[in-house]
Swiss-Prot record:
It comes from Macaca fascicularis (Crab-eating macaque). One of its GO terms (cellular component) is centriole. Residues 1-27, 347-383, 509-547 are annotated as: Disordered. The modification Phosphoserine is found at residues 81, 536. The keyword tRNA processing does not apply. This is Centrosomal protein POC5. Residues 354-372 have a biased composition (Basic and acidic residues). It comes from the Eukaryota. One of its GO terms (biological process) is negative regulation of centriole elongation. Hyperphosphorylated during recruitment to procentrioles in G2/M phase. Its main location: cytoplasm.
C-alpha cells in the first residue's frame, strides 16, 4: 500500500519541481536584461547633447518610475496572482515563485516600451546606486520569500507525511487485527477439524471393531445352523418312521373295529327300535286322554256362555221395550204441559213475529247462524238449525241406543204429514259434580214443533242413570260381545219456560231449517253404531211434537 502511494506521489513532486527550474531561468533572463540595460551606452551627438539635456533630466525619473512600477508589480503580484493550492508541495510554487515568474514578463514589456528612451540617455552613478539598492532590496526580499516558502513547504510536507504515516499505520493496524482475527478463526477451525477427525477416527475404529465382532458372530451362527439343520433332519427321519408305524397300526385297528361294529349294530338297532316304539305309544295315549278332557271342559263352558248370552239378550230386549214406553210417556207429558203453559201467549207471539218478519224480510234467515253461533248470548237454550247431531264421545247405555232409532223413525213419519220440520237440539252442558261423583250426564233439549205457533218452545232435561255395581262381575265378558249394561230408570225433570227470547231466536223458532229424510236416517244410523260401540250414557234425540 505505501509503496503504491509513493509511486503515485513521486511524479506529482517531479511535476511540481519543473516550475522551479522555469522560475530560475526566468530570473536569470531578467537579470541579464537589467544588466544589459544598465551597461548599454548609447551614441550621443555632441550638438544635440545640450538641446537634449533637459530631456535627460527627465529620463531618470522615467526610469525610476518604471523600476518602482516593477517593484510594486512584484510586491502586488503574490496577492493578485491566482493560487492553485491543491497539494502542500504546490504551495511554495503557487504563492510567490509563480508570481515572481510572471513579473519579468510584465517588466520585459515595460522595458521594451521604454527601451528606445532609456537607451538614448546616459546612466549616472546615482542612478546606478539607486538601481543597486533596489536590486539588493529585491534580491533580499526574493531570498527571504523563497526561504520562508521553502520552510513552509518543508513543514507542510512533514505534516502531510505524518498524516499519511498515521493513516497508513491505522490501516496497517486494522489489517493486522483482521489478519489476527482470521488466524484465530482458522486456529479454532483447525481445532474443530482436529476434534471431528479424531471422532471420525474413533467411529471408524469402533465400526471396524463391531464389524469384526459381527463377522465372528455370523461365522458362529452359520456353523450352529448347519449343525441344527443336520440334527433336525435326523429327528425328522425318526419321527417319520414312528408316524408310519402308527398309521399301519391304526389301519389294522380300523379294519377290526368295522368288522365288530357291523356285527353288533344289527342287534343294537333292533333293541332300540322296539324301545322307542313302546315309549311313543305310551306318550300318544296320554296326550289323547288329556286333549279329550280339555275338549269336554271347553265345550261345557261354551254351552254355558251361549245360555248366558241368550239370557242377557232377552233382558236387553225387555229393558229396551220398557225404556221406549217410559220415554214416550215422558215426552207426551212434557208436550201437554208445554201446550197448556204457552196457550196464553199465542196471540202476542204471532203479532210480534209478523212485525219482525215484515221489518227484516228475507234477511232474517241469514242471521240464524250468527244467533246460533254467538258465544256472547245468555246461557239459555238456543235453537240450532243443524241436522241430527251425533252424540259426543261419552257413555251411551243400551236403552238409549234403542231410543235414538225410534225417535228418528217417528220424526220421519211425522215429516210426511206435517211441514217436514226437524227439531234442532242444543247441548248446553253437564254439571262437573255429577261427572265426578256419579256417572251421570245431563243433556238439556230444546224442542220446537213445526205445526205449533211461533214463540211456543219446550225445554226438557232428560237424565239417564245406570247401575254398574251389580254388573261388575260380568262387565268384562259382556264388553267383548258388545252388550251394554241395562238402564235402571229414566227421570224426566220439568223446567220453567224461557220467557226472554231475542228476535233471531224467535225467527229461527218460527222458520226452522228443513232436513231430508236421507240425512236424518244416515245420522241416526251413525249415532246408533257409535252408541253401540262406546259405553256412553248421553244420547241425542230428535223429538217431533204433535198438537
Amino acid at each position: 500500500m505505501s509503496s503504491d502511494e509513493e509511486k503515485y506521489s513521486l511524479p506529482v513532486v517531479q511535476n511540481d519541481s519543473s516550475p522551479g527550474s522555469s522560475v530560475s531561468s526566468n530570473l536569470q533572463e531578467e537579470y541579464e536584461e537589467l544588466l544589459r540595460y544598465a551597461i548599454v551606452t548609447p551614441n550621443i551627438e555632441p550638438g544635440a547633447s545640450q538641446s537634449s539635456h533637459p530631456k535627460g533630466e527627465l529620463v531618470p525619473d522615467v526610469r525610476i518610475s518604471t523600476i518602482h512600477d516593477i517593484l510594486h508589480s512584484q510586491e502586488s503580484s503574490p496577492v493578485l496572482s491566482p493560487r492553485k493550492a491543491s497539494h502542500p508541495v504546490m504551495d511554495f510554487f503557487s504563492s510567490h515563485l509563480l508570481a515572481d515568474s510572471s513579473s519579468p514578463a510584465t517588466n520585459s514589456s515595460h522595458t521594451d516600451a521604454h527601451e528606445i528612451l532609456v537607451g538614448d540617455f546616459l546612466v549616472s552613478d546615482e542612478n546606478l546606486q539607486k538601481m543597486e539598492n533596489v536590486l539588493d532590496l529585491w534580491s533580499s526580499g526574493l531570498k527571504t520569500n523563497i526561504i520562508s516558502e521553502l520552510s513552509k513547504w518543508r513543514l507542510n510536507f512533514i505534516d502531510w507525511h505524518r498524516m499519511e504515516m498515521r493513516k497508513e499505520k491505522e490501516k496497517h493496524a486494522a489489517h493486522l487485527k483482521q489478519l489476527c482475527n482470521q488466524i484465530s478463526d482458522l486456529k479454532e477451525l483447525q481445532k474443530t477439524f482436529e476434534i471431528s477427525i479424531g471422532r471420525k477416527d474413533e467411529v471408524i475404529s469402533s465400526l471396524s471393531h463391531a464389524i469384526g465382532k459381527q463377522k465372528e458372530k455370523i461365522e458362529l451362527m452359520r456353523t450352529f445352523f448347519h449343525w441344527r439343520i443336520g440334527h433336525v433332519r435326523a429327528r425328522q427321519d425318526v419321527y417319520e418312521g414312528k408316524l408310519a408305524d402308527q398309521y399301519y397300526q391304526r389301519t389294522l385297528l380300523k379294519k377290526v373295529w368295522k368288522g365288530w361294529r357291523s356285527v353288533v349294530q344289527k342287534q343294537w338297532k333292533d333293541v332300540v327300535e322296539r324301545a322307542c316304539q313302546a315309549r311313543a305309544e305310551e306318550v300318544c295315549v296320554q296326550i289323547s286322554n288329556d286333549y279329550e278332557a280339555k275338549v269336554a271342559m271347553l265345550s261345557g263352558a261354551l254351552e254355558n256362555a251361549k245360555a248366558e248370552i241368550q239370557r242377557m239378550q232377552h233382558e236387553k230386549e225387555h229393558f229396551e221395550d220398557s225404556m221406549k214406553k217410559a220415554f214416550m210417556r215422558g215426552v207426551c207429558a212434557l208436550n201437554l204441559e208445554a201446550m197448556t203453559i204457552f196457550q196464553n201467549r199465542n196471540d202476542t207471539g204471532v203479532d210480534s213475529t209478523n212485525n219482525k218478519k215484515e221489518e227484516y224480510g228475507p234477511g232474517v234467515q241469514g242471521k240464524e247462524h250468527s244467533a246460533h253461533l254467538d258465544p256472547s248470548a245468555p246461557p239459555m237454550p238456543l235453537p240450532v238449525a243443524s241436522p241430527l247431531l251425533p252424540s259426543p264421545p261419552a257413555a251411551v247405555g243400551g236403552a238409549s241406543a234403542t231410543a235414538v232409532p225410534s225417535a228418528a223413525s217417528m220424526t220421519s213419519t211425522r215429516a210426511a204429514s206435517a211441514s217436514s220440520a226437524h227439531v234442532p237440539v242444543s247441548v248446553l252442558g253437564a254439571g262437573s259434580a255429577a261427572t265426578a261423583a256419579s256417572e251421570e250426564m245431563y243433556v238439556p233439549r230444546v224442542v220446537t214443533s213445526a205445526q205449533q205457533k211461533a214463540g211456543r218452545t219446550i225445554t226438557a232435561r232428560i237424565t239417564g242413570r245406570c247401575d254398574f255395581a251389580s254388573k261388575n262381575r260380568i262387565s268384562s265378558g259382556l264388553a267383548i260381545m258388545g252388550v251394554s249394561p241395562p238402564m235402571s230408570s229414566v227421570v224426566v225433570e220439568k223446567h220453567h219456560p224461557v220467557t226472554v227470547q231475542t228476535i233471531p231466536q224467535a225467527t229461527a223458532a218460527k222458520y226452522p231449517r228443513t232436513i231430508h229424510p236421507e240425512s236424518s236416517t244416515s245420522a241416526s244410523r251413525s249415532l246408533g253404531t257409535r252408541s253401540a260401540h262406546t259405553p256412553s250414557l248421553t244420547s241425542v234425540q230428535s223429538i217431533k211434537v204433535v198438537d
